[in-house]
Amino acid sequence: MVQCKKASIMPQTVASLKPLSIHATGAVDAQVFGARGARLARLAALGLDVPQALVYPPKLVDAIADGAEITWPRALGGQVLALRAAPQEAEWGGPESLLPIGVAADTLDHFIATRGEVEALRLQLQCIRNLGAAVSGATRNSIAPPPQSGDSAADLRHQIQTAREAYQAETEDAFPDTATGQLRAALRHMARGWHSASARILRAAKGAPEDAGLAIIAQVLVPNCRTGRLQFVDQSSGQAQLVGYVLQDGKEHPLSELSARECAALKALEAPLTRGHADACRVKFALDATGKPWLTDVRPAQRSARATLRIAVDLAKSELISREDALLRIEPRSLAEHLHHQIDPDETRDVVTTAMPASPGAATGRIVLSAQAAMAAEAQGEAAILVRHETSPEDIRGMHSSVGVLTIRGGMTSHAAVIARGLGLPCVVGAAELRLDMKARSFRGPKGRIFSEGDIITIDGTSGEVINGTCKMIAPDLGGPFTVLMSWADKVRSIGVRANADTPTDARAARSFNVDGIGLCRTEHMFFEPERITVMREMILADDAASRAEVLQRLLPMQRADFIDLFDIMRGLPVTIRLLDPPLHEFLPHEPDELEHLARVMNVGIDDVRARAAELAEVNPMLGMRGVRLGITMPEIYDMQARAIFQAAVAINAQGGAPVVPEIMIPLVSANREVELVKERVDAIAAAVQAETGSSFAYKLGVMVETPRAALRAKDLAKSSAFLSFGTNDLTQMTYGLSRDDAGRFMRDYVQRGVFAEDPFHTLDLEGVGELLVMAARRGRDTNPDLVLGLCGEHGGDPAAVRFCRLAGFDYVSCSPFRVPIARLAAAQASILAERGAALK
């Protein structure tokens, strides 16, 4: 059990402890006034109307809990009070408010004279009912039923007497019959409640220290008032609007029912509150009999991510905060809500299961279980959710045709997650509670719920929820405040942000997000168009180098056309092209009809196709014949790609304008000799193209650092490389010895049990993988001071990784197009905090 040590108060010091007025001048310490007391003091300092109030500081509250005597504060004489808890941090909680306090036998005549007999008696009954229930532990209704609007004075006197008797029966003590006695009982109850065992445990769970203190506010209740809540901006959009309600007869009534004068008085509060707090506010208020508003609390206005952005931009435009402060107020990841459809927060969700949110946004569509079915649905104009055990490169065309992707297996950097983020598709992965039955064309969810192909579901890639049926959506919002904020971010950031873009379509999306270039173009994704995949498969299944080279000549114009488009779209910006990386078996068909089609095209038997595919099979393909190993053992593949790149550069440069300087990246390198072998052939191809075309062009050759050995030997690699770009997906995988596709099965348990602070595929591991990055950066630049450093894994869109890369001296990060705004904002925040000398976390 958590123990809470309460400070001992010496008897001689108790008398010196006094309640403090919120209207006192000077600095207000939240440690003394509590969070709520400090807020009230600030309202008073702004010259706003706040009911008179005193704060009992924590040391005095502790003394009262120990039995210290108190008197009714002279400053609050003749008033009815409300007692409210004011811990130093609002989230720590505290005892419930107690009100009304102070209507007793010794004050009743005063209140009858000032408020009328019925109102005074009603207050006295409420006091006995509420305070009596709190002190005795009984329910309010067991002390007395609530007073009714038609009760006469005689009715109320009878109910008061009955309530006194009920209280005495519960406690064996008489109810306090003086205002001071009521105040003492209320304060003591709240103080002792704060130090109870259950309260200590709850506070500790919320991060409160053992010696956390409680202040208590005694505030005058505005007589004959209606209370309410109000904020000055719409919670969803952030646009200026009076939003709230007023309580009357125990019911919430819209502000529109108030008089025009009352609404104007409330509206007039907006300017001083916003100016005084440099933020949009929400308040609790009391309207007195004349319609004058009195403020009883203030908090930051409730707001969605979209509203947060608009509010920050509006405050900066009004010069209430700086542009830099506006940038710092936005959580970078929250920008995803601007970029994608989101489920309306008021929508009721029939959640089937919750898995890993791999790509933000939400989508509704019919279940399809294959890429072909997704393409067929698109052709018919139907929205489809592609559901697979896991995706592979041959599913990419189906993903393009879908509005969302759901996989049973996989993690944050699985194939489905990476491609979906690049396409801006909502994606949920690792839905292990679902049982996919391809024969039955359905999947079974928890509690035996069965969903068949063609049924409608919704996936929320922001929360990871899979939902039955349709959901109302909120559309993306990339205009106005979003554009303004991004322009401010670009003016202050000092690290480049590029995009991972594999096709011209991806490049156009990236360009729309104002990227600084393409940091990773995965050329293998260009081969999965229907008219190309068969040619690619012919090349893979060729028996010898000559046959392979012949087929590659048919692929050359296809690659060249894509590179021409990429260079044209990104004209004036760098484009980093990764040579073929995945193992060849990923391009081969698995479905019987596709195998038969390939056999017909190649004019061979289907058994021959199966046999050749079997020859290419590997026990651990991700660590086998892939990347640079393909380029060295089958050099004609990289030769074709290099030629296509250089011919495309010549074609674009012939049009005039900024010259294209291709950046060619070699994947999965572990030794500098690998780089030297590829470089020799690439340089030879460049010379040949220059001779053939009579054109000169510049290009850069670099390495994708994905293996721990490459990071450790960066000093060697820098001798032959113009740049090093760190592929942190595979680097994390190899550093940890984790499969990114299978880690989702246990990652949640590992994070919950504290093995990992975060999923290392989601947030960059700064201690392990980060140390490799820093080491490689330092060693590489020791050899080559002009070495360009980049990060092109999915971590490029992780705000913590962006800040880390800036500190480590990297030149750029690269991420999926729809994560570019997140990286741009994170980069700006890193620059601002560094300039201000703040510690980056």
Question: Would you name each region that the model predicts?
Answer:
Residues 403-409, 427, 790:
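A short, small-residue-rich loop immediately preceding and capping a beta-strand
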Residues 57, 391-394, 412-414, 433-445, ...:
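Short acidic loop-to-helix transition motifs that present clustered carboxylates
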Residues 2-346, 376-378, 382-385, 392-397, ...:
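Nucleotide/phosphate-binding sheet-loop regions of phosphoryl- and nucleotidyl-transfer enzymes
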Residues 26-30, 359-401, 769-785:
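C-terminal accessory/binding modules appended to enzymatic or scaffolding proteins
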Residues 203-210, 327-376, 383-384, 453, ...:
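Long, charged amphipathic helices and adjacent flexible linkers at domain junctions
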